[in-house]
């Protein structure tokens, strides 16, 4: 397993859990796992539409807004390797970030989201991604990332990180204490959220 050699510190998710592609969720009742083709398209479309909106200077929210337009906003494409790593982590039903998810090609960033409902349905991909988009309301474009409150804006900044080119996500839906929970993990390459770099180049 070459993934065991990739990470200088921490254990790679595929090194640690890569032998099984089945959920390992303890007492949680797993209803479904994986990302359908429709969901895959929804994830990529939703990301690219939002990236374009920000790049064109049409995002009015912020602390303060609006967000400045961008000149280097790559269009994201789906990457199956990133998705496999994301799915393997999602399958652990352990909300938070894994230790290492890099590939031989590049370091990899990550967004995670979780939402529960008491009804019989699960929140959609778009609902979870919108939670990341909405963090823009707390982002101050006049300060660098280091001087923003990273815990409040880090999902937004990875979503619109100009140099990121590829995305791959994993998802698991489970029931716990009658709560219908949807857990989404998206991996991004090359990674964003470097404290000493701009989120994107400005026009």
Curated annotation (Swiss-Prot):
<dbReference type="InterPro" id="IPR014044">
    <property type="entry name" value="CAP_dom"/>
</dbReference>
<dbReference type="Pfam" id="PF00188">
    <property type="entry name" value="CAP"/>
</dbReference>
<comment type="similarity">
    <text>Belongs to the CRISP family. Venom allergen 5-like subfamily.</text>
</comment>
<protein>
    <recommendedName>
        <fullName>Venom allergen 5</fullName>
    </recommendedName>
</protein>
<feature type="disulfide bond">
    <location>
        <begin position="169"/>
        <end position="186"/>
    </location>
</feature>
<feature type="domain" description="SCP">
    <location>
        <begin position="45"/>
        <end position="188"/>
    </location>
</feature>
<keyword id="KW-0020">Allergen</keyword>
<feature type="disulfide bond">
    <location>
        <begin position="25"/>
        <end position="93"/>
    </location>
</feature>
<keyword id="KW-0964">Secreted</keyword>
<keyword id="KW-1015">Disulfide bond</keyword>
<feature type="disulfide bond">
    <location>
        <begin position="4"/>
        <end position="15"/>
    </location>
</feature>
<feature type="disulfide bond">
    <location>
        <begin position="7"/>
        <end position="100"/>
    </location>
</feature>
<dbReference type="GO" id="GO:0005576">
    <property type="term" value="C:extracellular region"/>
</dbReference>
<dbReference type="InterPro" id="IPR018244">
    <property type="entry name" value="Allrgn_V5/Tpx1_CS"/>
</dbReference>
<dbReference type="InterPro" id="IPR001283">
    <property type="entry name" value="CRISP-related"/>
</dbReference>
<dbReference type="InterPro" id="IPR002413">
    <property type="entry name" value="V5_allergen-like"/>
</dbReference>
<dbReference type="InterPro" id="IPR035940">
    <property type="entry name" value="CAP_sf"/>
</dbReference>
């Amino acid at each position: 397993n070459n993934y065991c050699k990739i990470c200088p510190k921490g254990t790679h998710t595929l090194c640690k859990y890569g032998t099984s592609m089945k959920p390992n969720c303890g007492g949680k009742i797993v209803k479904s796992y994986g990302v359908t083709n429709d969901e895959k398209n929804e994830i990529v479309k939703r990301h690219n539409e939002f990236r374009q909106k920000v790049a064109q200077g049409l995002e009015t929210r912020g602390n303060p807004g609006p967000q400045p337009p961008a000149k280097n906003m790559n269009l994201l494409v789906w990457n199956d390797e990133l998705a496999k790593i994301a799915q393997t982590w999602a399958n652990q039903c352990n909300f938070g970030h894994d230790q290492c998810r890099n590939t031989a090609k590049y370091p990899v960033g990550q967004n995670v989201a979780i939402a529960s409902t008491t009804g019989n349905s699960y929140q959609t991909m778009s609902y979870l991604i919108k939670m990341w988009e909405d963090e823009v309301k707390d982002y101050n474009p006049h300060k660098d990332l280091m001087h923003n409150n990273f815990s409040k804006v880090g999902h937004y900044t990875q979503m619109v990180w100009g140099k990121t080119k590829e995305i791959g996500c994993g998802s698991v839906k489970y029931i716990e204490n009658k709560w219908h929970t949807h857990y989404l993990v998206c991996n991004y390459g090359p990674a964003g959220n470097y404290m000493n770099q701009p989120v994107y180049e400005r026009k």
